[in-house]
Amino acid sequence: MMKYFYALFLAVILPFFAVAQQVITYSVSPVSFDESEAITVTFNVNETAFGTASSHALYLWAWSIDSATVLQDCPTNGTWTASNPVNKLTYVSSSGGIGTYTYTMNTVKSFYGNRSNPLSKIAMLVKTINGSVQSQDILMNVGKFQFNLTNPVEGSTNVVTSGTVINITGTSTLPANFVVKANGTPVYTSSAATTTLNYPYSVTQDAAMEVVATNAADGTVVTKSFTVALSIPVQSAAIPSYMKQGISYDSADPTKVGLAIYAPSKAYVHVIGSFNNWAVSANYLMKRDTTNPDLYWLEITGLTPQQIYTFQYRTADGIKVADPYSTLVLSPYDDPYINQNANVYPNLPAYPTGQNFEVSVIQTAKPAYNWNVTNFAKPAKENLIVYELLVRDFTTQKTWQSLIDKISYLKSLKINAVELMPVMEFDGNNSWGYNTGFHYALDKAYGTPEKFKEFIDVCHQNGIAVILDIALNHATGRSPIERMWMVDPNGDGFGDPAANNPYFNQIAKHSYSVFNDFNHSSAATKYYVNRVLEQWIKEYKVDGFRWDLTKGFTQACAAGDDACTNQYQQDRVNILKGYADYQWSYDPSSYIIFEHLGTDSEEAQWANYKIGEGKGVMMWDKQTNPYNQNTMGYDTGSNFNRVKYSAHGFSERRAVSYGESHDEERLMYKNLTSGVSVAGYNVKDLATSLERQKAYAAVFLTVPGPKMIWQFAELGFDKSIYTCENGTVNTETDSTPGDCKLDPKPSAFGLNYDTNAARKSLYDTWAKILEIRLSSDVFNTKTFTVESGNLMPRLFIFNNTTSSALKNVVVLANFTSSTQNIVPDFPYTGSWYNLMDNTQSNVTSTTTPITIEPGGFRIFGNSKALATNEANQSKNAVSLVLTQNPVSNGTASIRYTNAKNGSLAIYDFSGTLIKTVQVSKDNGDENISINGLKTGMYFIQLKSEKGIAVAKMIVK
């Protein structure tokens, strides 16, 4: 994969699919050049491998590094999925399947954008127009005078015994004077200008070596460096008890830190960092744990409390990596751009000069965040209303602070959970977040860890849970646990996983692979995932995870085998159950949501897992197409009956249904571009389409069970998911190569959608529907019916376990293009109320049709909906509900609120006290043992400081 391309991310993001890489040969004329000169690069390409044997359409993707080591894209690249024609290579000829192509730059400086600093290096690769196939990275030095160190390898660490002679050799393009230095002291000076260096150096000490080549004609200097170190035995010692893999702080001693890394097949590991001037030294050679020899550890002492230090591990084979369990990572590729336009990350530590690759940050005695909410009562899984958002596109400021400033907007919508697209350290700063390199660290692009904690804290103060989307199916090539065991054909420090990599498959074991595929059967991978889950739950108090691409958690299939990947796989079932247990071990009430979109039989294995304990995994339930068919006005494919959990074979409400997600086209966009249009009624009209989105909410949000909304659906967001930054639309299937799916999208706030009257009316309607849904116990039921498929859907919801008078709800909608008389089939006659405004109707016949305008809806209840103040009073009252009734298997699952200092008492039907139980929290779920109770009816009484609640229990 493209290392420096990941580093830039200035204009584009790599689409999340595998990119085929082909090795090509090349030459440049002249061989050495200044930035003011013209050059011609010749490429020899296997045209069959690139798929261009007939089209000969290949393009240059280029970037440069200036004298300040700042990277920048070539201005004529275009986007990764749609190359600029300016960068098209000139086809010369073909022979034996190998095509010869050239590209001429009039001047190197102008081609790379006339950068203000002199160019140090230029880089390029050859690609197809849509980026599906690419060459390796090609890197060239700029300047007529060049010096190449041929031995040892530049930047290498050479561990040898004392007295070993190393031949230091190199060549220059022009006559030069050479000086070799050890720890800054010259040990060799050439007697005359020459183009070759050959000096035998006897190693007697650890030394930082420099070879300085000075152009005899003009004094231009080129310096190359490497390190020599005397070998010493690796000490074996038991790792201290306070340490584990990663960075461990000793609460009793803020002047030291423990570092430990799992490094099988590595002969030794050094720690290099700001505390030892980044030098390889015997004093920083890590020890082997006596119990686990593959675990290396070292204590760093003499640190100043609260001072920031940076470090890397350097393995015996010269690979430098940050700690995979870093909580803060500094990047030479991404960090220069974080605070360019705003102070997104105040006091961002500077990347250490002279280093390369990511580095870890350590800081002892760092002040802890003072949480306002320490024991958040999560909304019940069955009542979750999840708001999925991408920080990058939600506000114009794209920061945690800007999200904090919008809490009132979210709270007023009545949602009770936000689901953030991945915020773990990803490559670049402009991304959906699924290109994760460091799963343990928070990405810096949106702000500091403290500000992220504040966002979570504020959400909890407002009754909103926080769920993180997490991509544990894969990791990018920047990941330390990928780079430590890699095949590096270019010697640039990046490459694909090697056969001995303990974490990754060399070839993916499923057909949806992106980046590097984790081997989830590996004990090393399982430990890594376990630690990642623990970090986010304990450190940030997140309420759960949405697991991305769970179809990839198998070892049973081949990379291109769709059929196998989509079938039931027992190893995948077992692996993910194991991970669920890990997550629940840290927080038994933690939400687990899988994006699987697989067979019902496999999904039911997780949805029904430990359901008797009130657990069970929630499964993404895509209902985009049927709901969109309704909103557009087409009856074909409009049946959304699978919005019901039981249609999937789940025993409880564990289907997180959605009409929109980050991955699906926006309903409003399709309404406006493809909606039905007939005389007198046009779905493509904005006002008409916005009204239909109200009806969509009525037959979507009222269905019992968890639901998910994609950001700004409540405002009728109508920009295509394929909208480009310039406002055009480029899809995966249109004639323009590539697509703009991953491009940044405008914020609805920036478009003033939130102040537009028609859109605000839609928002208010959604908020009202959600208020009815969440304040009425009638919706906390498993007894409901969904009828759809004819553009006049009907929902029938019933709950006789609630103490509220509202026990029946009937929802009707008309998605046709004309007024319809819809038979309500009320369950009984009498007074029925439109819950949107509590207007009363006297129903004398349950089958008398209700006249509903096109795009309209009605939500009827047998009793009034609670007014807001009544709902608030209800929320402050004691409540007690059995989540499963009748009860069996010796356990009663209950849910209660306002139970501070409360106790439960179970009575039989005659009023005899059977047992008492002290509740463990103020609000939440609890399981009570009823072993020994005979079949029959009982009462459970909850008594607390706020009052008393009673529920009827039937034991089978």
Model-derived segments and spans:
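C-terminal outer-membrane/trafficking sorting elements
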Residues: 16, 871-956
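C-terminal beta-strand-rich structural cap/linker in extracellular carbohydrate-active enzymes
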Residues: 844-867, 936
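Conserved alpha/beta catalytic core and glycan-binding cleft of carbohydrate-active enzymes
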Residues: 541, 574-718, 722, 774, ...
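Aromatic-rich carbohydrate-binding modules that target alpha-glucans
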Residues: 57-113, 188, 250-253, 258-306, ...
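Residue-level detector of functionally pivotal "anchor" positions at catalytic/ligand-binding pockets or at interdomain
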Residues: 150, 783, 787-789, 862-883, ...
